[in-house]
């Protein structure tokens, strides 16, 4: 098991923090400082019809890509690629006390929908540190024994953990990649804001799925007011974080909801269209809009990328705790 600090900033990751705030308010996610150029941009896009059904038999002519408001020609579109690669990220901070059994159940559902022959998963946990419990493994079906014995403790660096895990998943080239976060939505120790974490994940095209673990509304012992506060944690900035990356938020309070959400996440990854186009070349953050030419279809994809800044320099690597 490896453990990494979740201090992201200064000499550890050297972030240049740009505009903050929600995309919906006309502001852009913060930008991380990187050095090498980006020539080809790849986008994972999920398409649905008006009934919410997946649409997968599209060609490049069926899409339109706007890079900074300018239409860009699509140079490649693929649907048949290698398997799924997911990082399952457990929140094991103090606020998750009482929630971990449900989080473990949700993770087991996720693993059950993977293809044993080609899909891979890795298991991570975090409080104020990120721990790798299981490296990326094809055919993973069972959670590591250590997850069953974790005692929730400490503060929560949710946004930092998401950004750092996304970078790990980003190394899994040629796969349908995602971070799946099992959390109650609390964050009281991150150095990154939600939009800053989202910018890092979005820039490397790793969708983030937030799997909200909350008390069951059917549980008569659940405090209704407390539950309302916990559900509210998954709206606003945290929902923006997921949406900007092309992911989604699922709030699951029952075993049935957790099973359905897990199945939907993996199904979305399997139905991605992988679109490629040439970057316009201007350094910095590029807002992206990917849409279908048919008004009967809706597309979900990441909100942008960083041109001229695709890879961290050597002094920007994550710090490993001895």
What are these regions (language model features)?
Residues 9-18:
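Bacterial N-terminal signal peptides
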Residues 21-322:
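Scaffold/interface architecture of coatomer-like assemblies
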Residues 3-7:
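N-terminal export leaders
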């Amino acid at each position: 098991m490896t453990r990494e600090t979740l201090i992201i900033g200064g000499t550890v990751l050297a972030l240049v923090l740009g505009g903050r705030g929600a995309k919906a308010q006309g502001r852009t996610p913060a930008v991380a400082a990187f050095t090498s150029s980006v020539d080809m941009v790849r986008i994972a896009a999920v398409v649905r019809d008006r009934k919410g059904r997946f649409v997968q038999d599209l060609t490049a002519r069926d899409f339109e890509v706007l890079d900074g408001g300018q239409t860009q020609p699509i140079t490649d579109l693929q649907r048949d690629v290698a398997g799924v690669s997911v990082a399952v990220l457990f929140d094991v901070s103090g606020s998750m006390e009482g929630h971990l059994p449900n989080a473990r159940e949700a993770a087991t559902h996720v693993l059950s929908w993977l293809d044993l022959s080609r899909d891979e998963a890795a298991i991570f946990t975090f409080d104020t540190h990120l721990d790798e419990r299981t490296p990326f493994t094809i055919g993973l079906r069972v959670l590591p024994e250590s997850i069953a014995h974790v005692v929730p403790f400490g503060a929560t660096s949710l946004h930092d953990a998401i950004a750092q895990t996304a970078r790990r998943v980003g190394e899994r080239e040629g796969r349908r990649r995602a971070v799946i976060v099992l959390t109650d939505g609390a964050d009281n120790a991150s150095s990154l804001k939600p939009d800053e974490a989202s910018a890092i994940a979005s820039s490397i095209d790793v969708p983030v799925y937030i799997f909200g673990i909350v008390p069951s509304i059917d549980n008569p012992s659940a405090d209704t007011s407390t539950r309302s506060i916990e559900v509210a944690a998954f709206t606003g900035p945290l929902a923006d974080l997921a949406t900007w990356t092309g992911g989604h938020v699922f709030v699951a309070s029952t075993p049935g909801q957790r099973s359905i959400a897990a199945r939907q996440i993996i199904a979305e990854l399997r139905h991605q269209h992988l679109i490629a186009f040439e970057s316009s070349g201007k350094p910095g953050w590029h807002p992206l809009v990917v849409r279908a030419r048919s008004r009967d279809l809706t597309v979900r994809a990441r909100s942008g990328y960083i041109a001229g800044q695709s890879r961290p320099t050597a002094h920007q690597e994550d710090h490993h705790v001895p």
